[in-house]
Amino acid sequence: MNTRFSNVYDDHARSEAYATLEFPGTYYLAFRDLPAIIGEHVHGRKAVDFGCGAGRSTQFLRELGFEVVGVDISEPMLARARARDPQGDYRLVPDGELGSLAANAYDLALSAFTFDNIPTMEKKVTLLQGLKRLLTAGGQIVNLVSSPEIYVNEWASFSTRDFPENRAARCGDKVLIVMLDVEDRRPVEDILWTDEGYREVYERAGVRPIRTYRPLGNPGEPYSWVSEAGLAPWVIYVLGRAE
């Protein structure tokens, strides 16, 4: 089995579409609560953005006051990040290899949606161990991932109605979803991963969940929620060293 960490956004057309996306609709819920979550759990100002893509989350962290390095496996996405943010620090990490970054140097490692595309338990564990190596003694990992519910419901920014096979998917299976906020409507292929599966990954990687958040849409927000008011499309794990 090929277990290399690949990225659908190496595709030129898809990376072009994704690079124009900000934080609308369902994506708003992924980032709405992060300032408060990070403020509660993270002490220090150095951060690494793992899977930074076009750099939106990297700039988000900088706006929160962090000195941040954005890393990604996709050169096309990094090129867009550098074009959008010429002053940013963006680095290529082939296959997610983080050995070029200093150990024990970062107070926060943010991973926003990256683990949705990592194919196996072993690869997830290895990458989390790599992120753990980067942390200061009191550093935290914030792992933002798609909930299993996102692949079997309709959302302001996503559709899964054309993929009934998603309902039979188990932890580690491929699932399909369409992004509605970009011109490129080809299905995105993700890897379904359950809460139970993530907790096993964390135990094997030597990190422990400190808090888990499942953000819901609220009345009065500037979006027409579909499932978001009752079902969380995202799960946000705050992780620390297990020692």
Task: Describe each region flagged by the PLM.
Residues 1-42, 56, 60:
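Conserved class I S-adenosyl-L-methionine
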Residues 44-46:
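Nucleotide donor/acceptor-binding cores
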Residues 48-50, 54-99:
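Class I SAM-dependent methyltransferase SAM/SAH-binding core
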Residues 100-109:
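A short acidic, Gly/Pro-enriched loop at the edge of an enzyme's catalytic core
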Residues 108-122:
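A short SAM/SAH-binding and catalytic strip from SAM-dependent methyltransferases
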Residues 125-137:
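A short glycine-rich, Lys/Arg-flanked "PGG" loop and its adjoining helix->strand segment in the class I
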Residues 142-201:
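SAM-dependent methyltransferase
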Residues 205-243:
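C-terminal lobe and adjacent flexible extensions of AdoMet/dcAdoMet transferase-like proteins
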